[in-house]
């Protein structure tokens, strides 16, 4: 059975980006509900003793949706930082190579997240085939992992992620998000992706976030 992971930062540490009340609902209720739903759905099934990575990559329907939403939220929390952090020289070089400049990457990332229709997630992910970083929109619970692409950065654009603090102003939320990216974590993900491929996602989920006894 899975448990809700604690936030990797204090709920009152994000200034005017996200409030403690927003985290109470987003983490304490929405994220918790996905954990509860998954535990109920896998009880008595072949997935009951499976790792979250295995469930994510081998399931479908409601089991997949809830497992993916657990992972997506865990990863999103790790992408956030109370204070600005610096990206590695390696990641900086890759973004400049693949997008032309850091400013162009920001522009493309925010535009993609702004124009995503309905609920979903906006990602930067490492394409193992092309060895390039891509910006990817996914609807609802979908994740690049199922397309064998390694997530590096994500922003949640479900309305429950920003409505409490920013109402329907998604662009305002996204601009503030960009000032709270944990580039140290994103840089680590890029380093892991180049070395271990999808194995880095397996390690992140099963060893760092949801390690089973």
From Swiss-Prot:
Record-level Gene Ontology MF annotations: metal ion binding; superoxide dismutase activity
Reaction catalysed by this enzyme: 2 superoxide + 2 H(+) = H2O2 + O2
Free-text comment on the cofactor: Binds 1 Fe cation per subunit.
EC category: oxidoreductase
GO biological process: cellular response to iron ion
One Pfam family in the UniProt entry: Sod_Fe_C
Cofactor(s) essential for the protein: Fe cation
Binding sites annotated in the UniProt record for Fe cation: 26, 73, 156, 160
PROSITE patterns in the record: SOD_MN (PS00088)
EC number: 1.15.1.1
Keyword line: Iron, Metal-binding, Oxidoreductase
Purpose of the protein: Destroys superoxide anion radicals which are normally produced within the cells and which are toxic to biological systems.
UniProt subunit comment: Homodimer.
Sequence similarity: Belongs to the iron/manganese superoxide dismutase family.
Protein name: Superoxide dismutase [Fe]
Organism, as annotated: Helicobacter pylori (strain ATCC 700392 / 26695)
Species classification: Bacteria, Pseudomonadati, Campylobacterota, Epsilonproteobacteria, Campylobacterales
């Amino acid at each position: 059975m899975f448990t809700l992971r604690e936030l990797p930062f204090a709920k009152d540490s994000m200034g005017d980006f996200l409030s403690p009340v927003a985290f109470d609902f987003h983490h304490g209720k929405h994220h918790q509900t996905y954990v509860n739903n998954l535990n109920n759905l896998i009880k008595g099934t072949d997935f009951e003793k499976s790792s979250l990575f295995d469930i994510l990559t081998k399931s479908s329907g409601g089991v997949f949706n809830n497992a993916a939403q657990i992972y997506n939220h865990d990863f999103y929390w790790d992408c956030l930082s109370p204070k600005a952090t610096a990206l590695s020289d390696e990641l900086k070089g890759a973004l400049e190579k693949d997008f032309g400049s850091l400013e162009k990457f920001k522009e493309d990332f925010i535009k993609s997240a702004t124009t995503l229709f309905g609920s979903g997630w906006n990602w930067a992910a490492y394409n193992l085939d092309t060895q390039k970083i891509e910006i990817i929109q996914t609807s609802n619970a979908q994740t690049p992992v199922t397309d064998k692409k390694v997530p590096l950065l994500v922003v949640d654009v479900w309305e429950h992620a920003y409505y409490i603090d920013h109402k329907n102003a998604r662009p305002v939320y996204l601009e503030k998000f960009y000032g709270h990216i944990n580039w140290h974590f994103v840089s680590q993900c890029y380093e892991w992706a180049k070395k271990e491929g999808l194995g880095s996602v397996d390690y992140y989920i099963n060893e760092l976030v949801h390690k089973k006894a």
